[in-house]
Amino acid sequence: MVTIRADEISKIIRERIEQYNTEVKIVNTGTVLQVGDGIARIYGLDEVMAGELVEFEEGTIGIALNLESKNVGVVLMGDGLMIQEGSSVKATGRIAQIPVSEAYLSRVINALAKPIDGRGEILASESRLIESPAPGIISRRSVYEPLQTGLIAIDSMIPIGRGQRELIIGDRQTGKTAVATDTILNQQGQNVICVYVAVGQKASSVAQVVTTLQERGAMEYTIVVAETADSPATLQYLAPYTGAALAEYFMYRERHTLIIYDDLSKQAQAYRQMSLLLRRPPGREAYPGDVFYLHSRLLERAAKLSSQLGEGSMTALPIVETQSGDVSAYIPTNVISITDGQIFLSADLFNAGIRPAINVGISVSRVGSAAQIKAMKQVAGKLKLELAQFAELEAFAQFASDLDKATQNQLARGQRLRELLKQSQSAPLTVEEQIVTIYTGTNGYLDSLEIGQVRKFLVELRAYLKTNKPQFKEIISSTNTLTGEAEALLKDAIKEQMELFLFQEQVEKN
């Protein structure tokens, strides 16, 4: 018979009591009432907060957006096909955040910062909230450094500064993405980190942009965030905020960043879809009442930081698509009122062969002129004035049969100036090359040439100046001014190249 010793039993009980861990865990849970169309309605989750992440039984993550008296409306970050009615959901106590690091450069990722380029995982030790508050007034300083796009029409007449928000607006197929990608290509060697956010685009279009950037060596300083047209609305809505969080990471590390949102119309449509499915009351054009806040809180994150914070910057180029040139629609007017100016691309100009199809008359930059270098200011003022007068005269000349000599000369000059603004895609020009081009046009050196010869002459002039007068570039880049010496060099180069060009043309004719 086994004898039970009381002291042994009490010893075992004492050991067990010592090992007992009195950890009490409270989990905020709920039950799925209904699921479908990327939306789930949850009963319970009493303590959940707006914007909090919730986790479903089978692993899908969602964001609690509607906090109602009887249920919680959750948008799903995924298709949610495996979620079943009656399954449990738990609140995570976290809001959406993504990992951030230098390793993201040259990669293509989705809205959750997961790589989608098949080049393996991205290592990151830090993370950042997708929705961070924008810098306050004291944290900023006014824009004063230029961000060159490499496009003559923009850098001369609608200049952009580091930390500015400049809207690119126009109909479909007018070259909006081309303007944005050319700007990325022009940042090579400028120590600017670029983030390109593609929202609701065709996968083939995004692949084309990535290929262009890779071929030109621009991917090494670029991050592409892509959520294509077949992605869930929630991820299309989040993608711009993910891009902004990545750009902010570099901005707060005293770096300069450029972010392109292509395009915010698609993000607004994704948000409208989510809101209508959540049964939020629709407003103008069926968009929810807070669609302005959707874009303002995103674009306010672009800033030029104060010297105390290291003078980093984040320049935003949001793109908005219009329907047959209607700038007074809801989303275009909202974004125009948030940004510091807009570049308007016209379908008529595009079809007339003027590319980039920038309508200089209604495009503005509200703060960029403070960032323009002096040399560009010296030549660009005259260009804008002459083009404005030309546009007025051209409209008038359609009705007048006989025009006096002065008017004919002005029309001829205007046509040549319009010609010098044309540029091929993926061929950005340096500031020095732009100054040469504008100076040649506004000072009448192109008036003697046929319109068809203008671009050929300018290409040859830029090459001639680069080879034979390298000191011109040195003067401009060191002083940022078109000095008397630089102007003399330029005049000599134009004269020499013009003689050579006319001689070559004569030889070709014969």
Swiss-Prot record:
It catalyses: ATP + H2O + 4 H(+)(in) = ADP + phosphate + 5 H(+)(out). The record marks 363 as: Required for activity. Pfam families: ATP-synt_ab, ATP-synt_ab_C, ATP-synt_ab_N. The keyword tRNA-binding does not apply. It is a peripheral membrane protein. Keywords: ATP synthesis, ATP-binding, CF(1), Chloroplast, Hydrogen ion transport, Ion transport, Membrane, Nucleotide-binding, Plastid, Thylakoid, Translocase, Transport. GO terms for molecular function: ADP binding; ATP binding; proton-transporting ATP synthase activity, rotational mechanism. It is found in: Plastid, Chloroplast thylakoid membrane. It is an enzyme of class 7 (translocase). The keyword Cell membrane does not apply. ATP binds at residues 170-177. One of its GO terms (cellular component) is chloroplast thylakoid membrane. Its EC number is 7.1.2.2. NCBIfam families: atpA, PRK13343.1. Produces ATP from ADP in the presence of a proton gradient across the membrane. The alpha chain is a regulatory subunit. HAMAP family: ATP_synth_alpha_bact. F-type ATPases have 2 components, CF(1) - the catalytic core - and CF(0) - the membrane proton channel. CF(1) has five subunits: alpha(3), beta(3), gamma(1), delta(1), epsilon(1). CF(0) has four main subunits: a, b, b' and c. Belongs to the ATPase alpha/beta chains family. This is ATP synthase subunit alpha, chloroplastic. The gene is atpA.
